Design a protein with these regions (language model features):
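Membrane-proximal, glycine/serine-rich, low-complexity loop/turn segments characteristic
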Residues: 1-5, 11, 17-254, 263, ...
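Short, solvent-exposed loop/turn segments enriched in Ser/Thr/Gly
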Residues: 257-259
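Short helix-terminating capping/connector loops at secondary-structure junctions
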Residues: 271-274
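Conserved small/polar residues in nucleotide/adenosyl-binding loops
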Residues: 280-282
Length: 282
């Protein structure tokens, strides 16, 4: 949950190098991130703002209801020698004359948006002198999720994420050989997801994953998204993906984290060149 504006550089430790420093937790490698620190010079203030849109890059193409019925008829002919659906039902599904009785639904399109907006704003203040250098970064990132909403419902159950970051680094030279470093960083994360979920400790999943899974499983002719009289269809064997996305309430979570690092570095090169001793408290 770092903001990109906080990152100065990063490096990767692998194999024995990682395990020597971080033990078994570093067995798969460790990414070390160096955050931005103050540079000597006049105060520099930089403001950035980005706004864009996100969209799925690749989605599967599903057959429509009429084609599904024709394919099922072919399969039924092999197994029982009979058609599962009449030609009149297939024609009615293709023509869409009575969507309540002969639905033809692309469930993936019914529960997802074509694109969603996202935005990022940051404030970067950097500067300092030989004695004191400082860096302050404030950042905000927000994005809306891909699940649809129902305007007739009082609440908005679609995915949403908002994150606020703060990072400040101070470097102070008490003496020509003594340096104090203070780093403070954290974030507040607010995330909202649809309330429908089948997640468990043994099989953890996100609500979005569950809803997309429903959209993949449901047949295009099981029932319409919503009946023309406004009632929501229900089926004992197939959950309505649209209802799961829009009428199952929502889950809102707040996560906050604050990290601090205090270090004192003493240059004792006059006693043993070159050598520096550092005391770090995290």
């Amino acid at each position: 949950n770092l903001s990109p504006e906080e990152i100065e550089s990063f490096s990767v430790l692998k194999d024995a190098t990682a395990t020597a420093v971080y033990g078994v937790k570093g067995a798969n490698g460790v990414i070390l991130i160096q955050t931005k620190r103050g540079q000597i010079g006049k105060p520099r203030i930089q403001i950035k703002a980005d706004y864009g849109f996100s969209a799925p890059t690749m989605l599967p193409e599903f057959v429509d209801g009429a084609k599904y019925m024709e394919v099922m008829n072919v399969a039924s002919q092999f197994s029982s020698g009979k058609d599962m659906y009449t030609q009149a039902a297939i024609n009615a599904t293709r023509n869409g004359t009575d969507p309540d009785l002969y639905p033809n639904v692309n469930w993936l399109k019914a529960v997802t948006k074509d694109y969603v907006p996202s935005g990022r704003v940051s404030l970067d203040i950097n500067g300092g002198s030989e004695r004191l250098r400082y860096s302050l970064i404030l950042a905000y990132y927000g994005e809306k999720g891909m699940t649809v909403t129902d305007p007739g419902v009082e609440y908005d159950a679609s995915n949403k994420l908002s994150r606020y970051n703060i990072r400040t680094n101070l470097d102070m030279n008490l003496t020509p050989s003594t340096e104090i470093n203070v780093s403070l960083g954290g974030y507040i994360l607010n995330q909202r997801t649809p309330g429908y979920t089948t997640s468990s400790d043994e099989n953890p999943r996100t609500p979005f994953t569950d809803i997309i899974k429903l959209a993949f499983k449901n047949t295009p002719i099981v029932h319409p998204v919503i009946y023309s009289n406004g009632q929501i269809p229900a089926n004992t064997s197939q959950t309505n993906p649209w209802a799961a996305a829009t009428h199952s309430g929502f889950i809102s979570s707040y996560i906050s984290s604050l990290q601090s690092v205090f270090a004192v570095t003493q240059d004792i090169g006059k006693l043993w060149h070159p050598l520096k001793l550092s005391l770090i408290h995290i």
